[in-house]
C-alpha cells in the first residue's frame, strides 16, 4: 500500500523520516550520503540508499519471521520503507563477534580475535558528545530506560546476533559486529528501529583471504578502499539468492 509523503520529521546522516496520513506510521527515505567518524568524513555514493533500504527490509523480515519485533512494515519503493512511528531510545547497542575497529584501537586486543562470548557495548547516541561508551553504572545513572528494559534489549540483541550469525554463515559471510537502535512503538513495546545494513554491520567474505578484499561494509569507505557499491551489492545479491533458493 502506498502512503502519501507528508512533512519532514527528521533528517539524519543517512535517512530522512517523513510523516504520512497514518499518525502512527512514517516513511523512511534512505539517502546516498556516506559518512564516517561522526560525519567528519562525508561523500555521496550513487545507489547506496537503494541497497541499504532493500538489505534492511530483507533482514527486518527475517527477524520478524523469528519473532523479533521491529519497526519495519513494508517497502514503499526501492529507497522508501514504511515503518511504525517510534520514540527512539538514544542508545546505540553494539555487539561484537570478532575484534576490529575501535575495540582494537582502544584496547590491546588483536585484530581478528574471536570474542566468545560476544562483547556487548552501549553508547550514548549524541554526535556532539561523540557517542560516548557507557559503563553499566553510567547507563543506569542516565535513567533512559528501566533495568528490566535494559535486560530486554540485551536479550533481543543477543538473539538477533545468533539469528544473523547463522544466516550469514550460510551465505559465506562472517558477521563481525553490528549496531542496533531501539525505540517504543505506539503500544509502548520495545522494537528494533533504524536499519540493518552494511552501514551499521561489518561483514567479511569467508571466500576471500585478503584482509582488505574480504571487507563488504562501510569500512571500505572509512579506509578509502573503494568498491563500496560493489561490496553492498554483493551482500544484497547473496541475500536475494538465498531468498530465491528458499522459495
UniProtKB/Swiss-Prot annotation:
Record EC number: 6.3.2.6
Domain of life: Bacteria
PROSITE patterns: SAICAR_SYNTHETASE_1 (PS01057), SAICAR_SYNTHETASE_2 (PS01058)
Family: Belongs to the SAICAR synthetase family.
Signal peptide: none
Reactions catalysed: 5-amino-1-(5-phospho-D-ribosyl)imidazole-4-carboxylate + L-aspartate + ATP = (2S)-2-[5-amino-1-(5-phospho-beta-D-ribosyl)imidazole-4-carboxamido]succinate + ADP + phosphate + 2 H(+)
GO molecular function: ATP binding; phosphoribosylaminoimidazolesuccinocarboxamide synthase activity
Alphabetic keyword roster: ATP-binding, Ligase, Nucleotide-binding, Purine biosynthesis
Pathway: Purine metabolism; IMP biosynthesis via de novo pathway; 5-amino-1-(5-phospho-D-ribosyl)imidazole-4-carboxamide from 5-amino-1-(5-phospho-D-ribosyl)imidazole-4-carboxylate: step 1/2
UniProt protein name: Phosphoribosylaminoimidazole-succinocarboxamide synthase
BP terms from Gene Ontology: 'de novo' IMP biosynthetic process; cobalamin biosynthetic process
